[in-house]
């Protein structure tokens, strides 16, 4: 079934619980790109260097990566709804505290707590949407990717609008919006059935013993380094006002959303997932290389254009991670995310450090190399990825229900 079908199983005809979860997911993803337009302002306001301020991303995603081992353990014991609410509560508290920070150290610490909340919420939200959405897992994944794209687009916009007055306001704004999400989840989402089997802390690591899933995770690790070099380091290179930087990353996020939800499925249908992923990674590598060596205008254009390739990659990686192994989807997703988020933590730290050690161009050269490395993994492991995913598709089709709530 086409997930965009206007029938009963169409993408837009969903229960209130799905819309409440998706809406809160938008705000959760806004928190990732929220700080982009205000990174220079934070550096100026707290007398910090670019590498110090970039730790806002590093602490956030380092905790998110480790928390992936915990999310399934928690949600399989207390249920999906309570896990979502726990995650939202963490975000509300730590986002609010981030706005009160008096030093970079405090802000980095509060962002780490924020990352824990976001991990609990975002990973569980995908499972909840898959289990409750009309139209099956294809529609659910597209709905989730829509929330991701919209959040990535609106996060920088909110950061720019509120951050132009003070870098503190975007954090308070996020806390308020997540509090609204907390109320919506409380009212509209019914308590979800717990899975028949409780997830252990080691299950995601054991799942990575599967060659196909490990290959997807390693490829995504390299890709995420490129992704977050663009997201976390480019604002310092562009060196624009919050409004202008917000506009650039809003356009970037719009392309990300459009290519995630509309373009990627059509490309996959025509060319196949692995060819699309490999080609998109190579194009992303070329894009960031031009970004690093081009003029300021060229850098702006390439930053926006990268959203298209990132959108395609996100959709294909998500589908591969959920379908390539014989592990339950939630466990496979947790193992996959555990690996790839470490790159999201590494890139914001190393990119400005590499600039300090060399020059402003080399971080983008490294990012281009990692994108190509991700494509190389896909090419080398293409047979295992293709055959195993096709063989396991019927098995995973039976898992779309209460068993996914361990994620």
Model-derived segments and their meaning:
Residues 68-79, 259-272, 355:
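Helix-to-loop junctions at the C-terminal end of transmembrane segments
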Residues 274-317:
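C-terminal transmembrane helical hairpin of 12-TM major facilitator-type secondary transporters
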Residues 324-360:
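A late C-terminal transmembrane helix in Major Facilitator Superfamily
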Residues 135, 142-186:
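Helix-loop-helix hairpin linking two adjacent transmembrane segments in secondary transporters
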Residues 2-12, 190-216, 401:
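Juxtamembrane intracellular "pre-TM" segments in multi-pass secondary transporters
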Residues 65-102:
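Conserved MFS/SLC helix-loop-helix module at the cytosolic interface between two early adjacent transmembrane helices
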Residues 175-194, 377-382:
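C-terminal membrane-cytosol helix-exit motif in multi-pass small-molecule transporters
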Residues 110-150:
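Cytoplasmic helix-loop-helix junction between adjacent transmembrane helices
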């Amino acid at each position: 079934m086409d997930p965009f079908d206007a029938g009963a199983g169409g993408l837009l005809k969903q229960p209130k619980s799905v819309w409440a979860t998706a809406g809160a997911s938008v705000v959760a993803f806004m928190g990732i790109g929220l700080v982009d337009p205000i990174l220079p302002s934070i550096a100026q306001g707290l007398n910090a260097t670019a590498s110090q301020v970039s730790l806002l991303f590093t602490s956030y995603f380092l905790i998110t990566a480790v928390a992936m081992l915990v999310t399934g353990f928690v949600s399989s014991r207390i249920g999906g709804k309570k896990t979502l609410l726990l995650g939202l509560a963490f975000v509300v508290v730590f986002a609010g505290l981030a706005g009160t920070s008096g030093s970079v150290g405090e802000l980095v610490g509060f962002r780490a707590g924020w990352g824990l909340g976001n991990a609990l919420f975002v990973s569980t939200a995908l499972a909840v949407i898959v289990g409750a959405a009309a139209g099956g897992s294809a529609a659910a994944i597209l709905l989730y990717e829509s929330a991701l794209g919209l959040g990535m687009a609106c996060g920088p916009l909110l950061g720019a609008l509120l951050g132009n007055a003070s870098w503190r306001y975007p954090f308070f704004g996020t806390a308020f919006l997540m509090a609204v999400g907390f109320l919506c989840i409380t009212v509209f989402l019914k308590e979800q059935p717990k899975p028949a089997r409780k997830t252990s802390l080691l299950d995601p690591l054991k799942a990575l013993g599967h060659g196909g899933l490990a290959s997807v995770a390693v490829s995504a690790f390299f890709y995420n380094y490129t992704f977050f070099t663009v997201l976390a380091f480019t604002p310092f290179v562009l060196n624009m006002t919050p409004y202008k930087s917000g506009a650039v990353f809003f356009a970037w996020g719009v392309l990300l959303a459009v290519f995630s939800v509309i373009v990627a499925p059509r490309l996959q249908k025509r060319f196949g997932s692995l060819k699309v992923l490999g080609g998109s990674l190579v194009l992303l590598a070329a894009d960031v290389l031009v970004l690093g060596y081009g003029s300021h205008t060229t850098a702006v254009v390439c930053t926006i254009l990268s959203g298209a390739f990132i959108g395609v990659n996100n959709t294909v990686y998500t589908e591969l991670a959920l379908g390539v192994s014989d592990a339950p989807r939630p466990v496979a997703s947790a193992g996959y995310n555990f690996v790839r988020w470490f790159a999201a933590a590494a890139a914001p730290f190393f990119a400005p450090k590499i600039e300090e050690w060399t020059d402003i161009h080399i971080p983008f050269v490294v990012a281009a190399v990692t994108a190509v490395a991700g494509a190389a993994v896909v090419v080398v492991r293409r047979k295992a990825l293709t055959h195993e995913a096709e063989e396991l598709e019927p098995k995973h089709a039976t898992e779309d229900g209460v068993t996914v709530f361990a994620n």
